[in-house]
């Protein structure tokens, strides 16, 4: 583990850029960027277009390590190059800590939650992540209803996989998303917090994790988790809120920082000039940084 990167993730001012839309969500991400499905004829062309978009983001002067602590990549992005370097090396040289999305998507809903599908090639994927100088990983589950058994299952699965990731020298981001439209969202979050605390308390002192959570209904609910000795940082997802709304809610949570995907890229378009693109990205970065650092 890179100690300098760990220090930056633990104490740095800023947020994490989530650039990890995978195969399933790529056509949608490209469409929002202004690239329609008739502009590519196969998966390779599609992934090249999305890599071009991400390259444009990470090489922009607005993608500044003074504001952006880390970036989460999709497996395809990790294996491609930016300006002649593997993406993670390009980011690290720029001062941005690279993470890799490792999950294979969500299973069918059961007990009000969606567990992660089995990650069958996890070991070899983590070995490749180490070769590519990745610092940490991210994996997402989804909680839709107040169901204690379901929430428990989500957290247990996350910690089980997290321990395999830690054993390979990487820092896992555990992401049990709570659907922002869930009927009992505030109650779900209390149960989730208790389960996460149990999982954290069962870790050895040297087993470090990060958490990526939905912004809680009750401000500062996750403060105790953020201060847990095994937690490097707690980050939040935008979860379907607009950037403005997500930023507003984030400002009410003292120890949390953003890890936004859609809310970061929502104003970026393929047809923008360099100046327009850099300004749109810069405005987004500025506002998300502000919500992550300057609290109410």
UniProtKB/Swiss-Prot annotation:
Catalysis performed (reactions): beta-D-fructose 1,6-bisphosphate = D-glyceraldehyde 3-phosphate + dihydroxyacetone phosphate
Pathway(s) of this molecule: Carbohydrate degradation; glycolysis; D-glyceraldehyde 3-phosphate and glycerone phosphate from D-glucose: step 4/4
Keyword Lyase attributed: yes
Family that this chain belongs to: Belongs to the class I fructose-bisphosphate aldolase family.
One Pfam match: Glycolytic
Protein name: Fructose-bisphosphate aldolase class 1
Superkingdom assignment: Bacteria
NCBIfam families: PRK05377.1
InterPro entries listed in its UniProt record: Aldolase_TIM, FBA_I, FBA_I_Gram+-type
Native organism: Staphylococcus aureus (strain MSSA476)
Molecular function, one GO term: fructose-bisphosphate aldolase activity
Active site positions: 175, 212
Enzyme class: lyase
GO biological process, one term: glycolytic process
Entry's EC annotation: 4.1.2.13
Keyword hit for Lyase: yes
Keywords: Glycolysis, Lyase, Schiff base
